[in-house]
Amino acid sequence: RDKRKAIIINAEISVPMLPVWLPEQIIQTNASVGQVLSSVEIDTSLVAGHVTVLKSYPFIGVMGYSAGENPLSYPEVKYAMVLQLVNAAARLVDFVILDCSSNMTNVFTPAAIESGDLVIRILTPDLKGVNYLKAHQPLLGDGRFHYDQHMTFAGMARPFHALDEMGHIIGGWDGLLPYGKEIDRCATEGGMFQAIKYCNPKYTASLNKVLDALEQMELADHAAEDEGNETEHFEEETADE
């Protein structure tokens, strides 16, 4: 809705995302998120130096693995380093979007879920998607993953999907992300950041639902800050008296 700054981070090394997001750009290995996650310590300057800014959307930056990198390119990623990466990125921009895989054994996914203020879960509305969720739900039972607060969307939804039945099994959908040929083409042809032009009203409504949730969280944070400032001011006045 506005042009506040954001960084999109994907740390799934089985499919390096920089050449998928930006196939027309030659991105050197030294721009890889692997360089950051394998560092001794992660700070804002290190993160800023490994962000690739989108030419079409200069307020959006991306971080991911570079072309040709694989699981043996770097030492095993540590959970704590992912948290450091997220915290450092959050100090640089207004929003950090963590693009997770469905693989919970990749430490980036559980660490991202733990650190996320708003978690969006996208499932295919079929038996495969539903059973994936049922299988992984026990892994997210710890309170730090705030499982019950996640938003769940039906992704790649098609007219023949049993949306109501699948939704009943998982407790309901927060919205639909319908399949669209144009969106699929954007993803497969390297134009992923152009896909917003082809979103139908149901897709857009789901995106707006996410934005509304973020706005509500921001308002709640501002209200809490104001209340804290008022309390501090009252305590100072009481001390003066």
Predicted regions located by residue number:
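NTP-binding/hydrolysis catalytic cores, primarily Walker-type P-loop NTPases
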Residues: 189-241
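Phosphate-binding loop that captures ATP/GTP phosphates
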Residues: 2-61
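Well-ordered beta-strand positions
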Residues: 95, 118, 172-175
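Beta-strand-loop-alpha "switch" segments that mediate conformational coupling across diverse proteins
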Residues: 154-160, 164-197
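Inter-motif core of Ras-like GTPase G domains
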Residues: 91, 107-126
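P-loop/Walker A phosphate-binding loop and immediately adjacent motor/lid segment at beta-alpha junctions
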Residues: 76-83, 134-160, 195-198
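Cytosolic-facing regulatory segments adjacent to core modules
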Residues: 43-57, 61-105
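Conserved beta-strand segments of the P-loop GTPase G domain that flank and frequently precede/overlap
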Residues: 9, 64-65, 97-99, 120-125, ...
